[in-house]
Amino acid sequence: MKEILLKQHIGSPAKAVVKPGDRVRRGSLLAVPEGLGANVHSSVDGLVKEIKEDRIFVEESVEQCDGFEPISGKDILSLIQDAGIVGMGGAGFPTAIKLNIDLKGGYLLVNAAECEPLLKHNMRQILEQPEKTLRGIDYAMQSCKAAKAVIAIKKKHEEEINLLLRTLPDFPNISLHLLPDLYPMGEERAVVREVLGILLPPTALPSEAGAVVINVETCLRIAEAVEEKKPSFLKNSTVAGKLKKGKESQVFMDVPVGTTVGELIKMAGGIDGEYGEILFGGPFTGTAVSLSTPITKTSGGILVTEPFPDLKGAKTGVLICACGGNMDRMEDLCKKYNATLTAVQACKQAVDVRGTLKCENPGNCPGQAAKILHFKNKGCTDILIGNCSDCTNTVMGSAPKMNLTVHHQTDHVLKTVGMEPMRYLTKSKTVEQLPVNEEGRQIPFPKEEKKQGSSGGGEERRDSGTLDAKEERKSDTEAFIEEGLFHIRIEEGQDIHIEFS
């Protein structure tokens, strides 16, 4: 039985256009949007058994055909709309609406950052289907009238980058921009900033910078819709964690929507003994789900963690970050850690935008010393944070000196797979871009310059020698002065006065 959710997108749940007893094929239209939303299609051949307010139950036929019921759009944009394609990086914004814009020669920015630790399915897609991915990018460019497209991808992915470089000569208006291996380089405004050098305010859309940002898997589904008239009912996903087949990430391509988390975990070998939780998504922004939760168009990762550590009721302060878990997630983790939630603060750069926290400058932190001092003054012994690579680094600049034990929301996930916890920033926030030949085409780095260490996510290790001098961590005194926590007053012939705020 497949449970196909009616809300797999930003907006309202779609309205069912089938009824119990109807026979459906793979690709059959099950529901249409009412207002903002996207079409929902069956991922299997079968019989509609039940319709609820939020989902449709389809009983699978014993025999499944290889084909599908095609869509009937007449141009690129209508095919994307009919296919029900949404942003497949997790946000789920309807793609036809996003691309229904005249950029007047602007940029299509393709997000291939895959910035959450452990997730591997975007890179597998590039390795297996580079040409089709690039064709999807070209179709998206035509839809939004972009003059150029830029694929934003982490520099560490050498094999994928070199494969794209070999394929790009057939697509002269598409280029690559290399990203550092830090979180959250895949955040929409971070992509705009890194590629175009424009920092948008938290309330702005990429269109204000003359750009549209689209996920790399979304581009693949666009190519399928245009070339094969194929609806969107499949999802690429990564499964990792406490599994019998090992802790390494396993990639599953073209998983039918409605497949349960439990079914996909079974395909990955099953859970190895007791576990803490199962996450949908990545270690930073994932949400806890059950084995019966169905896969949707936005389900990028399934992570099975080891059991939670026991903080034995420790007084814990929670630092909410726009780049990580929201308040509900952090409260849930406090309970699972057996911690006493004592104080809550938001990251210095987090601003409220229509009820959602947004970062003023994703991945660049001015310092968190004031927040840490607040926790100390409230009697906390521990702090739980969900911050990005840079913010976590600034927390570590002051919390240990105040005898506060730091826990990151990703700790139990990363420990499960043997990765180092997020603590100190050890890699530069800038990376060298690809060289260009005499014809103006990007080419691979010379071999002796190709190897780069990995950082970001949970792979960061404390190694101060890898940072440029200008990027070294501020001293506690510098951080406290910068945040206005105390002032030093020096007058000729007088004692030095330190005034605490």
Predicted regions and their residues:
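Iron-sulfur (Fe-S) cluster-binding modules
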Residues: 1-85, 142-151, 167-175, 248-292, ...
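Gly-rich Lys/Arg/Thr-decorated short loops/hinges at beta-loop-alpha junctions or inter-strand turns
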Residues: 108-122, 350-355
